[in-house]
Amino acid sequence: MLKDDMLEVALLGKTIGLKGAIKLHNRSDFPSQFKKGAKFYLTDGEILEILSFNKTNFVAVFKNYENIECAAKLTNKILYQSKEITKKTCKLGKDEFFYFEILGLEVFENEEKLGKVADIFEAGNFVFEIATDEKLIKKGFPKIFYLPYTDHFIDKISIEEGKIFSRFGFEILQNS
């Protein structure tokens, strides 16, 4: 299993009942991906297929784990999904992006590279943590700064170019 291509989507919790049901602790923004027939991966590369899923309680039964003894072996394991399958099964709206598409993008303002997106936080609106470009750090700017993901500060996101074009990002950096 290629770790770079995989996304953590759920933590498997405790078993429920005698027939192998297990609680899923969702770690994704797309709970609709959990349904009968969906396949996921464990860290060791094993593929788990959902035989039944209760979306109200977030409880699943996996193929070949249909009893409590087998299902108990899955407790505290992490479910993964590939980025490719995620793109196919989890639909986004206009001007929406997956986190994995945004992380690592370079941030530019007026053709000057400000840095790269290191993390994304949800604080009311989304906020990008930017790791400042080395050239700017050498000039005395902070190593990180935060850029709100709003139309006021983000002019354009181009996944194809690997860039985010900002407005007023440099002012935020100067005042950080």
Swiss-Prot record:
Primary location recorded for the protein, binned into one broad class: cytoplasm
Entry keyword annotation includes Hydrolase: no
GO CC terms of this entry: cytoplasm; ribosome
Keyword Cytoplasm: yes
UniProt-listed SUPFAM superfamilies: PRC-barrel domain (SSF50346), Translation proteins (SSF50447)
GO MF entry, a single one: ribosome binding
Subcellular location: Cytoplasm
Sequence intervals crossing the membrane: none
Subunit composition and interactions: Binds ribosomal protein uS19.
Family note: Belongs to the RimM family.
Physiological role: An accessory protein needed during the final step in the assembly of 30S ribosomal subunit, possibly for assembly of the head region. Essential for efficient processing of 16S rRNA. May be needed both before and after RbfA during the maturation of 16S rRNA. It has affinity for free ribosomal 30S subunits but not for 70S ribosomes.
Protein name as catalogued: Ribosome maturation factor RimM
Annotated organism of origin: Campylobacter hominis (strain ATCC BAA-381 / DSM 21671 / CCUG 45161 / LMG 19568 / NCTC 13146 / CH001A)
